[in-house]
């Protein structure tokens, strides 16, 4: 898929390649659906490069210690993997300013985090740059007034 340019983005994350199929995303957008990609920083920046109007949302725990606590408390990762994930998080944090929105995923407040993401999506729909057809139509209707 990489060689055939069938991915919007791809990157290696924790020693594995991950990517987003271009055809699927294009189909969803053509149907008027919103597409949310859960991807790491490398991939997000590649998407933004190819599609500059794409809003990027960085979702993060409020502190590094909270991130480590969550990774540890899951009990699914070895201490070595947790440390590797923390190093990756430190690298990713260097790019937070490249994102359009930062949303804190507070402990025991998942619903608030989801609502914040939904709010961003709703606001993005209302941007004037996404509503040029309406703007043109309204201006045309008001010409004779």
Task: Report each predicted region and the residues it spans.
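Conserved catalytic-core segment of NTP-binding enzymes
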Residues: 79-94
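ATP-dependent small-molecule kinase phosphotransfer cores
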Residues: 1-35, 42
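Alpha-helix capping/helix-boundary segments
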Residues: 42-43, 109
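Phosphate- and divalent-cation-binding pockets in alpha/beta enzyme and binding domains
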Residues: 46, 66, 112
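Conserved phosphate-donor/acceptor-positioning beta-strand/loop module used by diverse small-molecule
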Residues: 35-40, 49-73
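Conserved catalytic network of the ASCE P-loop NTPase/AAA+ motor domain
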Residues: 27-30, 48-52, 93-96
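Conserved AAA+ ATPase "sensor/coupling" helix adjacent to the nucleotide-binding pocket
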Residues: 1-8, 70-77, 119-123
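NTP-dependent small-molecule kinase module
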Residues: 94-145
């Amino acid at each position: 898929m990489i060689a055939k340019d069938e991915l919007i983005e791809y990157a290696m994350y924790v020693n594995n390649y991950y990517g987003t199929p271009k055809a699927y995303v294009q189909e969803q957008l053509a149907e008027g659906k919103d597409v949310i990609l859960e991807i790491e920083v490398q991939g997000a920046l590649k998407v933004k490069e190819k599609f500059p109007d794409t809003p990027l949302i960085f979702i993060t725990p409020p502190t590094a210690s909270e991130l480590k606590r969550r990774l540890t408390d899951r009990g699914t990762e070895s201490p070595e993997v947790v440390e590797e994930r923390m190093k990756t998080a430190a690298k990713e944090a260097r790019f937070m300013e490249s994102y359009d929105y930062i949303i804190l995923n507070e402990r025991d407040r998942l619903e608030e985090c989801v609502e914040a993401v939904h709010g961003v999506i709703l606001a993005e729909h209302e941007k004037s740059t996404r509503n040029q057809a309406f703007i043109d139509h309204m201006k045309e209707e008001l010409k004779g007034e």
